[in-house]
């Protein structure tokens, strides 16, 4: 596989995982929303 493709896939996965992760962290830090 091409290294650029692997890098783009990794970035995409990190971005998709960062969305729900930020929501969970904010809700956990702020308590009940």
From Swiss-Prot:
This is Photosystem II reaction center protein Psb30. A core subunit of photosystem II (PSII), probably helps stabilize the reaction center. Its main location: plastid. It holds the Pfam family PSII_Ycf12. It comes from the Eukaryota. Belongs to the Psb30/Ycf12 family. PSII is composed of 1 copy each of membrane proteins PsbA, PsbB, PsbC, PsbD, PsbE, PsbF, PsbH, PsbI, PsbJ, PsbK, PsbL, PsbM, PsbT, PsbX, PsbY, PsbZ, Psb30/Ycf12, peripheral proteins of the oxygen-evolving complex and a large number of cofactors. It forms dimeric complexes. One of its GO terms (cellular component) is photosystem II. It is a single-pass membrane protein. One of its GO terms (biological process) is photosynthesis. The chain crosses the membrane at residues 5-25. InterPro entries: PSII_Ycf12_core-subunit (IPR010284). Keywords: Chloroplast, Membrane, Photosynthesis, Photosystem II, Plastid, Thylakoid, Transmembrane, Transmembrane helix. It is found in: Plastid, Chloroplast thylakoid membrane.
